[in-house]
């Protein structure tokens, strides 16, 4: 165990460039050795170094997992097969989701075969590895294997060995979570099994089996949805209530599993769950309101004392502070569960909204446990959403007061100022970022009701940014010292990443205020923009700072240009934005080319003088030698999107639009940046519906390019968001346009356009139609 931990830490400290050559020189020979212990060691080592070597291994994920795939089912020794399966699971976690995308066809059959292993441990671990795999896998890649996988898991459930059954239940839950509605066909077979386990698993030795059955039932319910689960819901809820009424011993983890199951069932049943709140809420509020179990003693009194497993000890001077972590973990879990109920039920949660607010707000500075603070921070936007939903429906609070605008404003006033105050005192950079994220969300929900808190928010932003910039300067100073080494560099990089997240969330806060209040908020933001953001556009600042400054001004242009309010920033922003389009950093390029498109769309004639330079710069980005490389492709697709906006909104300023617009069309479809792809393909449809004079050409000679886009995008409309290239609404319009073209375009033109796509694309398009 110590050796494994050391290997993990060495890989993280030294990274792929140092560790992978050593591994490549050592592991293959060990894998071919006749001694099973050496083969076992090689596979364990491979799993341990993965986290630290992600960048290197991601270059060839199939090659990285190949040694494990070979040994998982073929090695004669069960402990080697176990190590191989363990390696597959670990690599799926560390190299996901790329490994699932690239190697699903190799990994899934191996795991399915390993589930039939003669060793219960290997079987059980194969099911556990399936959990790792499914968590990062798009449902489309799992679907072809679902029948075989479900058959295996059901066989394992019936097998009788408790360890195998427990792992099978966890895997079944994970598969249901991944498959979602596609799991419906297995529901009638699976649920009776699960209910049988829930009823029959009695005694201490079966506690975990029963707990995992709860977990599985709730995830299956969430996957198939309320309509299919509803006939069984009452029976399941009654079983859970009976178990809860019976109480749990202190060492019984069932209570924790039950709380999480209640939460999932709430998500499944929606408002039908409200009737069960009276059962669920009392113990949950009790857990959320637990006081920390803290003891302060003299350090010298306990030199010989044995430390308890769930007690954390901190030495402060000559004192010894003991904190019972199990209490804090229970409190944190309960707070997270409360967030879920508020989020799901919204106005339906109104009877409990006040006690939850009164529980959560004081926890913003609960310094005993970070997860408790994080949960409190995360709950506040959901609390406001619940209050807003109650206001819109004019619900009646338990006090008898109708929830109106005054009630909601009061709720905003109860939640937002303590969050701003907590931000200024928060010692952890990661939680500062979470607080800024929460503030951004609160501002978006509160809308005009945030106005009276803007001055305090901006003061909080200034204080946070000042502290962050000071810490950056201190880190840069440290990096310049003579004895600064690689290990310190690794730590500094991690600190910098956390600091960058603070700046990211600050930008999100400003964006949220601009989206909520538009141009009228600009005067209040002016000092912040002038003193902190504009200087970050300078070429001497770090790429991350430049990117964030560009993102902020992108938002200014996008959301505060009504009445020309943003034009005062145009001259100061256009230059850095165009320069950023060819920056060495891909993220700076992406933010910059996006900004060019925003200005083209929002600023009208005022942007006209910048159109020639913008066209030239975007062409540089799009035509760069490695424009479609993995690191650059998102910036490239955003550049194509911005070129489209210039074509649509700045047409009069384009020299030779009859050639530029078809050139833009020929760059489509977009396939990598799914958000931008959906936006651009919707724009294309909009331009076609408006009979754009330059898009198709005088004799519809560019119709083939349109058909190519439709053939790629249309079949994806029904897929998950990660794979969807056009919305369902856009797909409907594409179909209507194709039908319209069949009646209005000459047959020979249609034939020529149809021949521009492959037979496979033709078939996919016909099926989509």
Which residues does each predicted region cover?
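Karyopherin-beta/Importin-beta family HEAT-repeat alpha-solenoid scaffold
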Residues: 1-769
């Amino acid at each position: 165990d110590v050796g494994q931990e050391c290997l993990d830490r060495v890989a993280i400290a030294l990274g792929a460039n140092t560790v992978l050559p050593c591994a490549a020189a050592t592991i293959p020979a060990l894998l071919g050795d006749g001694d099973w212990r050496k083969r076992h060691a090689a596979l364990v080592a491979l799993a341990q170094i993965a986290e630290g070597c992600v960048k290197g291994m991601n270059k060839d994920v199939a090659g990285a997992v190949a040694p494990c795939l070979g040994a998982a089912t073929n090695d004669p020794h069960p402990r080697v097969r176990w190590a191989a399966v363990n390696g597959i699971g670990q690599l799926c976690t560390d190299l996901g989701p790329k490994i699932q995308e690239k190697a699903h066809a190799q990994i899934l059959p191996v795991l399915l075969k390993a589930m039939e292993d003669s060793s219960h441990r290997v079987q059980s671990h194969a099911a556990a590895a399936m959990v790792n795999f499914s968590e990062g896998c798009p449902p489309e890649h799992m679907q072809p294997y679902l029948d075989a996988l479900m058959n295996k898991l059901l066989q394992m459930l019936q097998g009788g060995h408790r360890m195998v059954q427990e792992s099978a239940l966890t895997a079944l839950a994970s598969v249901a979570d991944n498959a979602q509605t596609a799991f419906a066909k297995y529901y009638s077979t699976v649920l009776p099994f699960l209910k049988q386990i829930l009823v029959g698993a009695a005694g201490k030795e079966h506690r975990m089996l029963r707990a995992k059955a709860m977990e599985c039932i709730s995830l299956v319910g969430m996957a198939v949805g309320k309509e299919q689960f509803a006939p069984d819901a009452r029976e399941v809820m009654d079983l859970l209530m009976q178990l809860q009424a019976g109480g749990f011993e202190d060492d019984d983890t069932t209570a924790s599993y039950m709380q999480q199951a209640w939460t999932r069932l709430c998500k499944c049943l929606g408002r039908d769950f409200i009737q069960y709140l009276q059962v669920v809420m009392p113990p949950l509020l009790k857990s959320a309101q637990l006081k920390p179990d803290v003891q302060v003693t003299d350090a010298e009194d306990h030199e010989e004392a044995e430390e308890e497993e769930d007690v954390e000890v901190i030495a402060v001077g000559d004192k010894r502070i003991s904190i019972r972590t199990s209490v804090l973990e229970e409190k944190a879990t309960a707070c997270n569960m409360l967030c879920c109920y508020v989020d799901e039920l919204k106005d339906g949660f109104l009877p409990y909204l006040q006690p939850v607010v009164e529980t959560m707000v004081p926890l913003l500075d609960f310094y005993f446990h970070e997860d408790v603070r994080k949960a409190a921070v995360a709950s506040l936007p959901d609390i406001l959403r619940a209050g807003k939903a109650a206001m819109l429906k004019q619900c009646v609070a338990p006090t008898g007061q109708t929830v109106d605008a005054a009630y909601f404003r009061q709720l905003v006033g109860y939640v937002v100022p303590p969050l701003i105050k907590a931000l200024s005192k928060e010692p952890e950079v990661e939680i500062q970022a979470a607080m800024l994220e929460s503030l951004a969300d609160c501002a978006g929900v509160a809308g005009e009701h945030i106005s009276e808190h803007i001055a305090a928010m901006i003061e909080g932003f200034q204080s946070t940014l000042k502290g962050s910039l000071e810490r950056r300067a201190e880190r840069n100073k440290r990096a310049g010292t003579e004895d600064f080494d690689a290990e310190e560099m690794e730590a500094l990089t991690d600190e910098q990443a956390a600091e960058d997240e603070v700046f990211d969330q600050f930008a999100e806060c400003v964006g949220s205020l601009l989206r909520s209040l538009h141009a009228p908020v600009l005067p209040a933001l002016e000092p912040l923009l002038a003193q902190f953001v504009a200087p970050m556009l300078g070429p001497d600042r770090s790429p991350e700072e430049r990117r964030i400054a560009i993102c902020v001004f992108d938002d200014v242009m996008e959301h505060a240009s009504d009445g020309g309010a943003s034009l005062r920033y145009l001259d100061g922003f256009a230059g850095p934005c165009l320069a950023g389009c060819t920056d060495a950093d891909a993220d700076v390029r992406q933010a910059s080319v996006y900004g060019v498109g925003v200005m083209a769309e929002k600023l009208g004639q005022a942007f006209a003088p910048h159109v020639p330079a913008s066209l030239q710069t975007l062409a540089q980005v799009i035509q760069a030698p490695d424009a479609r490389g993995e690191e650059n492709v998102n910036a490239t697709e955003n550049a194509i999107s911005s070129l489209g906006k210039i074509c649509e909104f700045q047409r009069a300023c384009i020299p030779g639009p009859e050639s530029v617009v078809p050139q833009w069309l020929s760059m489509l479809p977009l396939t990598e940046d799914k958000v931008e792809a959906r936006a651009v393909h919707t724009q294309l449809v909009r331009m076609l519906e408006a009979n754009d004079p330059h898009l198709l050409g005088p004799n519809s000679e560019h119709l083939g390019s349109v058909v190519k886009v439709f053939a790629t995008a249309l079949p994806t409309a029904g897929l998950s968001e990660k794979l969807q290239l056009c919305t369902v609404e856009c797909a409907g319009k594409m179909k209507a346009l194709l039908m319209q073209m069949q009646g209005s375009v000459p047959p020979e033109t249609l034939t020529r356009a149809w021949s521009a796509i492959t037979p496979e694309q033709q078939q996919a398009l016909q099926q989509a139609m």
